[in-house]
Amino acid sequence: MNTQTYTQRAQARPRPRIAVVTMGVKLGDETRGYTRFRVLSEMLVEQGFDVDLITSSFQHWEKAQRDTSKTCYQGLPYNVVFIDEPGYTRNLDLQRIRSHHVAAKNLRERFERTAGRYSLIYSEIPPNDVARVCAEYASEHNIPYVADINDLWPEAMRMVVNIPVLSDVAFCPFARDAKRVYQLLSGAVGTSDEYTARPAKDRTTPYPHATVYVGNDLAAFDEGAREHMADVVKPAGELWAVYAGTLGASYDLATLIKAAALLEKRRAAHTARTAAAGTARQHRPFPPVKVKILGDGPDRQRLEELAWQENAPVEFLGYQDHGSMAAWLRASDITVNSLVKSAVQSIVTKIGDYLASGKPMINTGSSPEFRNKVTTDGFGLNVEAENPGALADVLEELARTPSLRKIMGARGRAVAEREFDQRTSYLAIVNLLRNLI
């Protein structure tokens, strides 16, 4: 065969088509949602694949149906396919479970109508029943299936509802679906080493795998911070500790509020004591620390009431789009990853943005993997969860030691550039999929 004929045949060979399945993604002109699967779809197309990004008609963050006829969902590098889903109003209730069940059923019907279309299926888990449809269909049609494990259900659910016997019965379907997915998968991508290793508990055969943090688009973060920096006004001499994310069951904002109140009382007492003794200049400066809470969620009203009761220097700024959030984080002095003791989350979505800010991080999460990373990489300090006094101690140490903040912040930014920038880190996913097709 001559070179010209070989080249012509190679050019005529159809590009492998991958189904990327996610029930939660920010698309088009939407302002809320995760970008992981959108960015991955774009990169797969750039790397020589055709992609159907299959997602829900229901926008999880807005809790509303999408207008799927909008032009912003068309003309993209990948093909967007919407699966009908009735929707729900809360993140954890029976309505959401039923909604995902309907979506899984409709996804199965869609796969059956398009049999032979895909060379590989890639989906997130959870939702477990949606992932099970993907895994079983791929197995039946002898094509690879790869799970993107970004949370553990039902383990995470037990943190909210843990009633002996009753919880076991209620969560049995989730455990059953997860086990089936883990047994059938051809490969796994986890957003932490813990998640990547989870399928091994339910199978004996090894599987190709990669740990790829959720991360962020570092260039977009920096651009958003530049564009919105003028909107953030910071009084001279004031330090900010910032939390960005959901105000819900997993995230321990109550302890952060109590710690802020305690720290302000300490500062006031210190100022009065040193002023009376005439020794203020002999001590390290003790600047006021204000806590800025970016985000929204079901616990917001309760937390606002707690802040008022504690007379805590805390401001609730509500939901911010990514550019505004980047500006607030860049203007901060300390970032706080505040989780309850029972939280099973490992390396959560916000970590990439915290590190990108170039500011030190306080971590109250209990994940051994992430606590070790905080210490080993040197970008922050770990604190025992649900301990206001311990959190106030660390806030004070960072507030009164500018050099430590600078060193830790620089280390965090370096980690963001090396491990959390989606445009480079996601190449590991692309390569894993390429090797399976």
Language model features with spans:
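Donor nucleotide-sugar binding/catalytic pocket of nucleotide-sugar-dependent glycosyltransferases
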Residues: T55, V146, P154, D168-R226, ...
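N-terminal subdomain of nucleotide-sugar transferases
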Residues: M1-Q74, A261-A272
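A short, well-ordered alpha-helix in the C-terminal region of glycosyltransferases
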Residues: E397, L404-E419
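Acceptor-binding helix/loop patch of EC 2.4 sugar-transfer enzymes
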Residues: A12-P14, M23, G87-Q95, G116, ...
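Conserved donor-binding/catalytic core segment of Leloir-type glycosyltransferases
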Residues: A230-Y251, L256-A261, K292
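Nucleotide-sugar-dependent
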Residues: Y251, D321-W328, T335-L355, I362-N372
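Nucleotide-activated donor-binding/catalytic signature segment of Leloir-type glycosyltransferases, i.e.
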Residues: R281-K292, Q301-S324
